[in-house]
Amino acid sequence: MAALNEFVSVVVSDGSRDAGLAMLLVSRPPTNALSRQVYREVIAAADELGRRDDVAAVILFGGHEIFSAGDDMPELRTLRGAEAETAARVRRDAIDAVAAIPKPTVAAITGYALGAGLTLALAADWRISGDNVKFGATEILAGLVPGGDALARLTRVAGASKAKELVFSGRFFDAEEALALGLIDEMVAPDDVYDAAAAWARRFLDGPRHALAAAKAGVDAVFELPRAERLAAEQRRYVEVFSAGQGGDAGADPHGG
C-alpha cells in the first residue's frame, strides 16, 4: 500500500489473490468532502494507477459508509476570484484524471454520492451501488452549477431532459432510479458493494492490457473528439495494438475473427 498524502490512497493487491486489482481510496471522514487538496491527491493517485505495470483494473471507493457528499462547501465559500477559478480547474482535472486511467475502472458506491461525488463516480467506467444509496446533482441547492464536466457526463448517460430535471431540482434520488436511468450498472445489498465491484473488475484482470486501453480510449473519444480526429486516433491505436500483438502480446485475431 502506497499512501498518497492525507486523504487519498492507492492500494494494490499483494498478488496472493486478485493480482493486478487496485483501489483508489478516498478517506476524509465523515463525508469524504472533496477539497482542493483531495482533488490534487486524486490526480496523483490516478496518474500512479495509470503508470503502474502491476495494476490491471481499479476500484474507486470511499469506504463502507459513504462514497462522497460532494465539494467541501465551507472551503468553497471562502474562495474569491482567481482562487475559485483554480478550484474549478483542479476539480475538472481530477475528474478527467480518473476518467483517463487507461484501465477498466469500477466505482463502488456506498451511502451517498452527491454533487461532485456523483460526478466522480460517473468518471468510472462502471458503477456498483448499494440499494440504500442516495444520489443527487445537488449543486443548485447551494446556488451553484455542477462542475468538472458533470453536465456532459450526466447528460451522456441520462439524456438531456432527465439531466435538466435532476440538475434544476437538485433532488435526491435512490439507487433504483439510478439503475433505471443507467447511472449505475448494478445494485446490491449495502454490505456487498465492494465485493460486487471487485467481481466486476476481476473479469478484466487477465485481459490484453494494450487492447483494453485502446478500446477504452476509442469509446471515450466518441464523445470527446471531432469525427475526423477520432477516426485518425482510432486508426493509430489499431496499428499500435496490432503491432504489439505481432510481438506476442495479443491472443486474438485483430480483425475480430
From Swiss-Prot:
User: Which controlled-vocabulary keywords does the entry list?
Assistant: Fatty acid metabolism, Lipid metabolism, Lyase
Lineage of source species: Bacteria, Bacillati, Actinomycetota, Actinomycetes, Mycobacteriales
Its recorded reaction(s) are: a (3S)-3-hydroxyacyl-CoA = a (2E)-enoyl-CoA + H2O; a 4-saturated-(3S)-3-hydroxyacyl-CoA = a (3E)-enoyl-CoA + H2O
Class of this enzyme = lyase
Q: Which NCBIfam families match?
A: PRK05869.1
Where does the secretion signal sit in this chain?
none
- Superkingdom is Bacteria
GO BP annotations of the record are: fatty acid beta-oxidation
Q: What is its EC number?
A: 4.2.1.17
Query: Pfam families per the record?
Result: ECH_1
InterPro entries assigned to the protein according to its UniProt record, in alphabetical order: ClpP/crotonase-like_dom_sf (IPR029045), Enoyl-CoA_hydra/iso (IPR001753), Enoyl-CoA_hydra_C (IPR014748)
GO-annotated molecular function? enoyl-CoA hydratase activity
The gene is: echA17
Protein task: Could possibly oxidize fatty acids using specific components.
The entry's protein name is Probable enoyl-CoA hydratase echA17
Q: Where is this site: Important for catalytic activity?
A: E139
Q: Which family does it belong to?
A: Belongs to the enoyl-CoA hydratase/isomerase family.
